[in-house]
Design a protein with these regions (language model features):
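Well-ordered alpha-helical segments embedded in enzymatic catalytic cores
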Residues: 30, 49-52
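Active-site-proximal flexible loops/turns
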Residues: 1, 27, 106-112, 144
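Thr-Gly-centered strand-to-loop micro-motif
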Residues: 19-21, 74-75, 136-138, 153
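Hydrophobic face of alpha-helices
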Residues: 50, 84, 151-153
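Conserved AMP-binding/adenylation subdomain of ANL enzymes
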Residues: 1-41, 56
């Protein structure tokens, strides 16, 4: 999926910044060094990386000026509510933080960020366009305001 996003970005004239290596080596802030130096505007990462960065005690906000950074997108697993707090206090206060859900198998996002909506701690902001998605409990019933499985209930326009 990231390949498709990168190809689309390149077609629009965007400059991509990629890192090849361990995201916490040689030090926990190596990706933020790169983001600062390259004036990254949108930083894509994983929920696990943000949790590990917090565990390492990195105070990015205190050590890195990131004036170009407008948004951080997190994927790979649900972003813990504590990670929202960490980004808001120790990475870049006021940055748009979007937890997204989708994947390689669908080449799309079921849910993603939206700059017109507020960011809520521990929540996905909105469904992707054309996505019929519900949360189901263990019995296979649609639930609202409860934890469960994210289920796509109908085909969607960009379905592979």
């Amino acid at each position: 999926m990231m390949w498709n996003w990168m190809a689309s970005a390149l077609a629009l004239g965007v400059t991509l910044v990629l890192y090849d290596g361990h995201p916490l080596h040689p030090e926990a802030t190596v990706l933020w060094d790169m983001a600062r130096d390259e004036r990254v505007t949108v930083f894509g990462t994983s929920a696990r990386y943000l949790a590990l960065l917090e565990k390492a005690g990195a105070d990015v906000a205190a050590t890195h000026a990131l004036p170009a950074l407008r948004a951080i997108c997190s994927t790979g697993s649900p972003l813990a509510p504590e990670s929202y707090d960490y980004v808001a206090t120790r990475v870049k206060p006021g940055v748009r933080l979007s937890s997204i859900s989708g994947g390689t198998d669908i080449v799309s996002c079921f849910a993603l960020g939206n700059p017109a909506l507020p960011v809520r701690r521990g929540a996905l902001q909105c469904l992707g366009l054309g996505m019929a998605v519900e949360v189901w409990d263990d019995a296979g019933h649609s639930v609202v305001g409860e934890a469960g499985e994210l289920v796509c209930t109908r085909p969607f326009p960009s379905m592979p």
